[in-house]
Amino acid sequence: MATNGEKVTATVVNGGGLSTGENPKKIVDLNTTELDRTDDILDGEVKGFSDSGEKKEETDSNGIGSTAGVDSGDISPVDDIQKKIRRAERFGVSVKLTEEEKRNSRAERFGTVAAAVVNGSEGTKKAEELKRKARADRFGVPSATSTTDKTEEEAKKKARLARFGKETKVDSAEENKRKARALRFSKEASADASSDLPEKQIIGKEAAVSGSAA
C-alpha cells in the first residue's frame, strides 16, 4: 500500500497490465485524480467495443444515413427508379411504377428522351406526324395532312351524294314502271272478269230452268 506522502508509479507494457520490466512503455502516475485521455489505450474493455465492432457499425450506419440524406436530393429520377428495381429484385418484390417513371426508365434504357416530356403537346404532335410519314413511306401511301384529309372527305361526300342521287332517280323510274305494270294487270283482270260474267249468267239461267221443269 502507498502512503499519502509517497508517489507511486507503475509501468505498463502494451496495455497488458502492470509490470516491472526493464523496458517500460509508459509511466503512469497513479496519484493523479484523472488520467490523460491518451491513456484510454490501457483499458482493453473500453476499446473492446470498437474491437467487437458495435460502435463501429453504429458510426458506419450513421455515416451511411447521412450520406444517403445528402445524396438523395442530387439523385436523378432515373437513378431512383433503377434503385427501386434493384431493391425489388433483391427482395423478390414486384415493382409498381407510375406512368412517368415508366417513361423515364424506357427513355433511359433506349437512350432517348421522351418527346412529350421535352416539348409537351407540340412534341407529341410532331412525333405523331413523323410516325405517320414514316409509315406512309414504308407502305407506299402518300402522307395525308389535315388539309388533304379535309379535301378527301369533301370529295368522298360529293361522290356519295352524286351516287345516291342517281339511285333515287332510278328508283323513281322503277316505281313508275311498277305502277304502269300494276295498272295494266288490273285492267286485264277486270276485262277477264267481265268476259266471264255472261257465261256465268247463262249457266245460272239454265240451272234455274231445269229446276223449275223438274
Swiss-Prot record:
<keyword id="KW-0539">Nucleus</keyword>
<feature type="modified residue" description="Phosphoserine">
    <location>
        <position position="76"/>
    </location>
</feature>
<dbReference type="InterPro" id="IPR044209">
    <property type="entry name" value="MOS11"/>
</dbReference>
<comment type="function">
    <text>Contributes to the transfer of mature mRNA from the nucleus to the cytosol. May function before mRNAs enter nuclear pore and in the same mRNA export pathway as MOS3.</text>
</comment>
<keyword id="KW-0813">Transport</keyword>
<feature type="region of interest" description="Disordered">
    <location>
        <begin position="39"/>
        <end position="78"/>
    </location>
</feature>
<keyword id="KW-0597">Phosphoprotein</keyword>
<protein>
    <recommendedName>
        <fullName>Protein MODIFIER OF SNC1 11</fullName>
    </recommendedName>
</protein>
<dbReference type="InterPro" id="IPR040746">
    <property type="entry name" value="THO1_MOS11_C"/>
</dbReference>
<dbReference type="GO" id="GO:0016973">
    <property type="term" value="P:poly(A)+ mRNA export from nucleus"/>
</dbReference>
<feature type="region of interest" description="Disordered">
    <location>
        <begin position="1"/>
        <end position="25"/>
    </location>
</feature>
<dbReference type="GO" id="GO:0003723">
    <property type="term" value="F:RNA binding"/>
</dbReference>
<feature type="compositionally biased region" description="Basic and acidic residues">
    <location>
        <begin position="39"/>
        <end position="59"/>
    </location>
</feature>
<dbReference type="GO" id="GO:0005634">
    <property type="term" value="C:nucleus"/>
</dbReference>
<feature type="compositionally biased region" description="Basic and acidic residues">
    <location>
        <begin position="164"/>
        <end position="177"/>
    </location>
</feature>
<feature type="region of interest" description="Disordered">
    <location>
        <begin position="137"/>
        <end position="214"/>
    </location>
</feature>
<dbReference type="Pfam" id="PF18592">
    <property type="entry name" value="Tho1_MOS11_C"/>
</dbReference>
<dbReference type="GO" id="GO:0005654">
    <property type="term" value="C:nucleoplasm"/>
</dbReference>
<keyword id="KW-0694">RNA-binding</keyword>
<comment type="subunit">
    <text>Interacts with RH15 and RH56.</text>
</comment>
<keyword id="KW-0509">mRNA transport</keyword>
